Amino acid sequence: MAHITINQYLQQVQEAIDSKDGFNCADLVSFKHPHVANARLQLLSPEEKCQQVLEPPYDEMFAAHLRCINAASNHDFVEAYKYQTLVVQSFLKSFQAHKEENWALPIMYSITLDLRIFANNADQQLVKKGKGKVGDMLEKAAEILMSCFRVCASDTRAAFEDSKKWGMLFLVNQLFKIYFKISKLHLCKPLIRAIDSSNFKEEYTMAQRVTFKYYVGRKSMFDSDFKKAEEYLSFAFEHCHRSSQKNKRMILIYLLPVKMLLGHMPTIHLLKKYDLMQFAEVTKAVSEGNLLLLTEALTKHETFFIRCGIFLILEKLKIISYRNLFKKVYLLLKTHQLSLDAFLVALKFMEVGDVDIDEVQCIIANLIYMGHIKGYISHQHQKLVVSKQNPFPPLSTVC
């Protein structure tokens, strides 16, 4: 394949189209396939050759693909993205014309994946040259992916196995990757709704479902819907292929903070296994209600947590640390009427800076409001009066 002529290549394409062999055709238009390294296919003007062998719109599609190969070989990713856009647009013409059949879905997967990758590379190239903003090309790519999504979603006439709706989840996952990259998470909402209401929801491949759950779980975490985040991220982690250590680690980066906010602390064994020891001191601090250690741990690994986009989520663990510290005070004093001074002493012991009795009242009022403490503040007696039954409810019942 690395040394075939342009005519041999186009003949293979024509045979794949004639036999409706979507997988073979997808290979012949994929940048993961070795043909893209073949210098004999890097033509400046391949249109005439393509028109001699292929029918429209495939002639236009594969001419654009060959121009894209040429641009990519010259590391001109802006030009490559332009031609990859043409590839997808030409493909859509034929895809829409294929009524009640979906053999071309593998082609769509291949070319839309490459479109997103080229858009990302083009973005970086333009930003480096000072000619564009981060995400400009990805945003345009998302619009083209949405055109593909609409074609798939509107296929209501085909039989279940022949439906183009099988392509919806792949496209949604590609769009999620773009929206997370350009920080436009609100655009995920209608896509999530479309998949949740689809009767294909449980039929998609496990790999696609894992990716979907991972992104929806992350979005739920940013929306502070921690129970949904735990459910979706746990599904992704449990069903991710056991050999995919890297992917499992990536899921854990978001699952761990969610679990901790719900009161489930990770074991050191788990953190060591997935090389996530950055969480070890955070876990210890929250479990002990040690605010001093928590602040130090967050500061020490700040760069890692910010890069992963979880620093602000981990900051929410401070309120859990207050809850755990104040629970220790309650267990120590063994009374349901607790002097506010006792909490002030505990906070000063933890070196919480410039804390006074007013701030203690404010922290406790917040904990009561959030459901972390069952009780009330008696301002007259300067005491916290807690419930005799379960005054510090389990975190999983609160968040």
From Swiss-Prot:
Domain PCI per the UniProt entry, residue ranges: 210-391
A Gene Ontology molecular function term of the record: double-stranded DNA binding
Pfam families membership: PCI
GO CC annotation, single: transcription export complex 2
BP terms from Gene Ontology: poly(A)+ mRNA export from nucleus; post-transcriptional tethering of RNA polymerase II gene DNA at nuclear periphery; transcription elongation by RNA polymerase II
InterPro entries per UniProt: Csn12-like (IPR045114), PCI_dom (IPR000717), WH-like_DNA-bd_sf (IPR036388)
Family membership: Belongs to the CSN12 family.
Stated name of the protein: PCI domain-containing protein 2
